[in-house]
Amino acid sequence: MSKQILILPGDGIGPEIMAEAVKVLELANEKYSLGFELSHDVIGGAAIDKHGVPLADETLDRARAADAVLLGAVGGPKWDTIERDIRPERGLLKIRAQLGLFGNLRPAILYPQLADASSLKPEIAAGLDILIVRELTGGIYFGAPRGTRTLENGERQSYDTLPYSESEIRRIARVGFDMARVRGKKLCSVDKANVLASSQLWREVVEQVAKDYPDVELSHMYVDNAAMQLVRAPKQFDVIVTDNMFGDILSDEASMLTGSIGMLPSASLDANNKGMYEPCHGSAPDIAGKGIANPLATILSVSMMLRYSFNLHEAADAIEKAVSVVLDQGLRTGDIFSTGCTKVGTQEMGDAVVAALRNL
């Protein structure tokens, strides 16, 4: 029986980078006889333009029925002035919540070919390989109550809520420990337990879960210190587990240690490893339509999809190898370009990966 993959290109550069990722996926599908069937739909601003909402019910139903979802990016200035509850980003939050995608895996890997593109000195960044495990469906992005009220003195006051239950913390902690167990057996839990009640519970529950993983070394770090340590000595980290907002911020910070956020894929998984896969970067409306966006993060998201949702490690390894081959050839989009390399556009980069994959 075939596996169903739902393609959601989204907004901005989303359609451009997705086109290249789909070419790679289609070749892998043929080369390794994967039995995938691909279908396409809209999300974010594109869905607002078509349906009036950032995620139509029928699209959500198709996502539920699919075996995996491949997403481009959402958002753009065109929709910045509309009501917050129907902005493009709400479609992304909704699909994550409705599919139960609570575990977000964000790798930060510095390819040796891109050592000069890192914001850090080579001796600090060389060999960097961090995995950030971010809780994705709880915390301050979903907490209630939230809103804006007018005080007695006439001044407006806005407020948000950062709730976490024991079960929410426990399940994401287990993802972190499981990932650490198959990597370097080191897990750093990042919180703000010196200030936040939610972080105090977070730390307590993570300590409880740690008893089931005696082979994994657990450490704790406050988020402000973690942000500093990522720049000072990033290779001290192997796997980081943290909450929604902290993970959002730290993973973007970690991305620049690798040279470009355009290189970084991500996976969002449910309890059964059904997932949605997307690049870490946004929709980059400033370069949309110019054919210069880096498609490698989206292509590497395909590799993560094959690995984590389907256990197709041979095909996943081949895609990652093809990307490495292209980098060895000196091909670079503008965001990772350096002297002595050849600057290429979105389609050229995608074609090069396809050619490399075909020749493996």
UniProtKB/Swiss-Prot annotation:
Quote the cellular component terms of the Gene Ontology held in the record.
cytosol
> Any idea of its EC number?
1.1.1.85
- Enzyme category, top tier: oxidoreductase
Annotated residues that bind NAD(+) are located at 76-89, 282-294
> Is Oxidoreductase one of the keywords UniProt gives this record?
yes
Question: Keyword Manganese: yes or no?
Answer: yes
Q: How is the cofactor bound?
A: Binds 1 Mg(2+) or Mn(2+) ion per subunit.
Residues the UniProt record annotates as site (Important for catalysis): Y141, K192
Enzymatic reactions: (2R,3S)-3-isopropylmalate + NAD(+) = 4-methyl-2-oxopentanoate + CO2 + NADH
Which PROSITE patterns does the entry link to?
IDH_IMDH
Q: Name one GO biological process term.
A: L-leucine biosynthetic process
Write out the pathway annotation from the protein's UniProt entry: Amino-acid biosynthesis; L-leucine biosynthesis; L-leucine from 3-methyl-2-oxobutanoate: step 3/4
Q: Which residues bind Mg(2+)?
A: D224, D248, D252
Gene Ontology MF term list:
3-isopropylmalate dehydrogenase activity; magnesium ion binding; NAD binding
Region forming the signal peptide: none
Role played: Catalyzes the oxidation of 3-carboxy-2-hydroxy-4-methylpentanoate (3-isopropylmalate) to 3-carboxy-4-methyl-2-oxopentanoate. The product decarboxylates to 4-methyl-2 oxopentanoate.
Q: How does it assemble?
A: Homodimer.
Its protein name is: 3-isopropylmalate dehydrogenase
Q: Which organism is it from?
A: Pseudomonas fluorescens (strain Pf0-1)
Q: Which gene carries the instructions for this protein?
A: leuB
